[in-house]
Amino acid sequence: MSDIKYELAHVGINAQNPEEAKATAALFAQIFNLQPREGNSSTFAGNAVEVMRTPYLGRNGHIGMYTADCEAAVKDLEERGFEVDMSTAKYKPDGTLNAVYLKQEVGGFALHIVRKP
């Protein structure tokens, strides 16, 4: 059993275009009383729902999982037989790993780990 802790960060939904992304995020925001906001490549409803402006990884979208130490989480996942796609890695300015996707989809969703803020 691993000592690495994971918790849900957000659910990502693939939209076909920016207009659909904005409308989808706005509806989630309205239903759940969340604050909509624009990100670099997506539109958010609060922190829980991310709607991609164009289709991205995962047939249905992605699920982001927080962890305190992404490097340790990558090691943990690989030791347990899960492959990490380092070509998707995002780094903080200080060079520490901030996010990375796994190669495997689950239920049509890509999975990625994100360093907990």
Describe the function of each predicted region.
Residues 21, 74, 108-110:
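Internal amphipathic alpha-helical segments of the cytochrome P450 catalytic fold
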Residues 14-16, 52-53, 68, 103:
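A structural detector for beta-sheet-dominated domains
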Residues 1-22, 58-65, 117:
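N-terminal beta-strand motif that seeds the catalytic metal site of vicinal oxygen chelate
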Residues 43-62:
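Short, intrinsically disordered low-complexity segments
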